[in-house]
Amino acid sequence: MSMLFYTLITALLIGIQAAPHTESNVPAGHAIPQAHWIKLQHSLDTVLRRAHSAPAGPIAARVAGQTHNITVDPKLFKKRRLRSPRVLFSTQPPPVAADTQDLDFEAGGASSFNRTHRSKRSSSHPVFHRGEFSVCDSISVWVGDKTTATDIKGKEVMVLGEVNINNSVFKQYFFETKCRDPNPVDSGCRGIDAKHWNSYCTTTHTFVKALTMDGKQAAWRFIRIDTACVCVLSRKTGQRA
């Protein structure tokens, strides 16, 4: 930035010295052509535009080949509005087995960022008491290979797979939940009266903030991910309440 400032000052001084202020103070035969002055002004405008468009905030990042070359300021993850319990930046895959749900990734630690108090996740189903069953069967996993997603405007965007934080490559993970089977039983959802109701299990979605590509810069966007499995009911034709 200092080099750019020095260049601007130098060009400005040259322009001031070369500019003809009046007819009386310019020696005969040494007048600067108007075309040269226009060219100098155009060069200054170009430099100013480049300086104005250069990313300066912590969110902005330049792409230099591969995605892990995108550098992100770790202070960015301390902003509460950018945190999500379903999004994790980590150098290692998060634990997903039931016997590892007591493991935690501390926010700002050596291996992960942007963790919150809701950090314990498991791919296993909730523990039901004897005689209790889930209407739909779901599966939850940490997804670390997401490359594209749909944003809140319905537009397909590119998701950043890796970023550089404190000279370490962190992968972006998403905790997603979806239906294991649309029909856990032959009639549809488990425990539904098939005589009066049609039913099936379907995956629902929500939007979380994630790092995506916006042109040649990294930017936060709300993207859609799978978050739950629910049962959809419809009354069978001819049935009355």
UniProtKB/Swiss-Prot annotation:
One of its GO terms (molecular function) is nerve growth factor receptor binding. One of its GO terms (cellular component) is extracellular space. One of its GO terms (biological process) is nerve growth factor signaling pathway. The keyword Glycoprotein applies. The keyword Magnesium does not apply. Keywords: Cleavage on pair of basic residues, Disulfide bond, Endosome, Glycoprotein, Growth factor, Lipid-binding, Metalloenzyme inhibitor, Metalloprotease inhibitor, Protease inhibitor, Secreted, Signal. SMART domains: NGF (SM00140). Residues 1-18 form the signal peptide. A 1-acyl-sn-glycero-3-phospho-(1D-myo-inositol) binds at residues 173, 209. PROSITE patterns: NGF_1, NGF_2. Glycans are attached at residue 166. It holds the Pfam family NGF. Homodimer. The homodimer interacts with a single NTRK1 chain. The homodimer interacts with a single NGFR chain. The NGF dimer interacts with a single SORCS2 chain (via extracellular domain). The NGF precursor (proNGF) binds to a receptor complex formed by SORT1 and NGFR, which leads to NGF endocytosis. Both mature NGF and the immature NGF precursor (proNGF) interact with SORCS2 and with the heterodimer formed by SORCS2 and NGFR (via extracellular domains). The NGF precursor (proNGF) has much higher affinity for SORCS2 than mature NGF. Belongs to the NGF-beta family. This is Beta-nerve growth factor.
